[in-house]
Design a protein with these regions (language model features):
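Charge-dense polyanion-binding interfaces
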Residues: 152-178
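An acidic, gly/pro-interrupted, aromatic-rich
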Residues: 1-129, 133-135, 167, 173-183
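Amphipathic alpha-helical segments that form the core helices of the histone-fold
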Residues: 140-151
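Long, internal low-complexity/basic segments
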Residues: 137, 141-142, 162, 166
Length: 183
């Protein structure tokens, strides 16, 4: 009915999902994991491993920060009235393979590990990363995933199998559209 009344969305009754900006994605990862250095002011840096907010990155045209470029940070050579927002496969691969994303996931897992049961940890992970409770089917699938991951880590001789399985869960949640898009 709403679509018939306003097919062009002139009354703004629906919203097109928008991807978060590069700086917001990076800062959110650091904040959720407890790794964010909230120190204000001071010199900027080109070191991508820095734990301060992304606003403290220096812009050097000959040495751009790959993660920021991947998520469409502003081009420093030209003036831009608005940012483009691309959706490309390397963005998803970034959440699967980036060392900083893994570091944030392990730190976040350390917070979840304090929960006594995996079900509680799964709910806490969902609430922290995507802001909602998991559905029953999501909880079941993730519980199976975490059990398989923990068994794999145990078979590899790891003593911290549960924490690593929780880190895998956090890393999966970081890659969800619900984390990087605003509806």
């Amino acid at each position: 009915a709403k679509m018939k009344a306003d097919p062009l969305n002139k009354l703004h009754w629906r919203r097109t999902p928008a991807r978060l900006q590069a700086e917001v994605i990076r800062d959110s990862l650091l904040e959720m994991s407890g790794l964010l250095d909230t120190k204000m002011y001071g010199a900027g840096t080109l070191d991508e491993r820095m734990k301060r907010r992304s606003i403290y990155f220096m812009i050097k045209r000959s040495k751009l920060i790959p993660t920021m470029q991947l998520f469409d940070s502003p081009e420093p050579l030209v003036s831009q009235g608005s940012r483009p927002s691309t959706i490309i496969a390397p963005q998803a691969l970034h959440f699967m393979n980036n060392a900083q994303v893994r570091e944030a996931a392990v730190a976040l897992a350390g917070q979840f590990e304090k929960k006594t049961e995996d079900g509680d940890a799964i709910s806490l992970a969902y609430q922290t990363v995507v802001g909602r409770e998991p559905t029953i089917s999501e909880k079941k699938s993730i519980s199976e995933f975490m059990n398989a991951q923990a068994e794999s880590y145990k078979a590899g001789g790891r003593n911290d199998a549960r924490k690593l399985a929780l880190a895998d869960l956090a890393q999966v949640l970081f890659g969800l559209n619900e984390f990087i898009y605003v509806n």
